[in-house]
Design a protein with these regions (language model features):
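Short, surface-exposed alpha-helical segments at coil->helix boundaries
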Residues: 1-4, 29-33
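ATP/NTP-dependent adenylation/nucleotidyl-transfer catalytic domains that generate, transfer
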Residues: 2-9, 14-17, 24, 37-51, ...
């Protein structure tokens, strides 16, 4: 939402295209369409559901011997089902950009980057990221200042695919009850008087940062 508002302000609505990419069905697609309508920008819907299904079938056809031999089971790993749609979405975005002669805007922010909460070569990609240096709390302030609807700006971030919010997923991953980006943002900005994590929780956050920081580093070449 905020990146769309920034793009229209910078380039004009006639030069911005919103691309909605459900994986089959997605209940909050109406929110994306609402943003496009409010801004008066062209919108496209590219459903990646059939492509995801076809790719998965093609991959598993070549692995059936391993499944039969018990090396693999028939259950699709969570890492595949979570990250592959994100990469297909980015492929679709670059396809649209190539056809229209445009560029892909990355919508990631600093809060997500600190914890590596993105897919490598998926939603972490893009030509450039206008909000990459800002925390979720700061992005929300920018959105409100631009006049974006408060309910959309304050909406809990989620990928629209796994059925839970980013904060719920991170709370489980970090084993931190009631984890929110707002709480994390105080730590990122070193507002120590506002930080309410325990020492053990901070250590787990730092551990995850060190584990995932490869996603925001320049790729190492030989």
């Amino acid at each position: 939402t905020v990146v769309a508002y920034l793009a229209v302000k910078a380039y004009g609505k006639e030069n911005v295209v919103g691309v909605m990419m459900p994986n089959g069905g997605q209940k909050d697609l109406s929110d994306s369409k609402r943003v496009c309508d409010l801004l008066g920008i062209k919108s496209l819907t590219v459903n990646i559901g059939d492509t995801y299904k076809a790719l998965t079938e093609a991959v598993y056809v070549n692995l059936m011997d391993d499944v039969s031999n018990g090396i693999l089971n028939n259950e699709i790993p969570n890492q595949y089902s979570t990250n592959t749609p994100a990469r297909l979405r980015m492929t679709a975005l670059y396809g649209v950009a190539a056809i229209l002669g445009g560029r892909v805007l990355n919508t990631g922010n600093r809060s997500e980057d600190v914890l590596g909460f993105s897919t490598f070569y998926g939603d972490s990609a893009g030509s450039y990221g206008p909000i990459c240096d800002y925390t979720v709390s700061e992005v929300r302030q920018i959105g409100l200042a631009l006049g974006a609807p408060e309910d959309l700006v304050m909406k809990a971030p989620d990928d629209g695919m796994c059925g839970s919010t980013d904060e719920q997923n991170l709370s489980k991953q970090l084993n931190i009850p009631n984890f929110t980006y707002e709480r994390l943002d105080h730590l990122i900005r070193r507002e120590m008087n506002e930080v309410d994590f325990t020492v053990d929780e901070i250590n787990r956050i730092v551990e995850l940062y060190n584990k995932m920081k490869f996603k925001i580093e320049i790729i190492q070449m030989p």
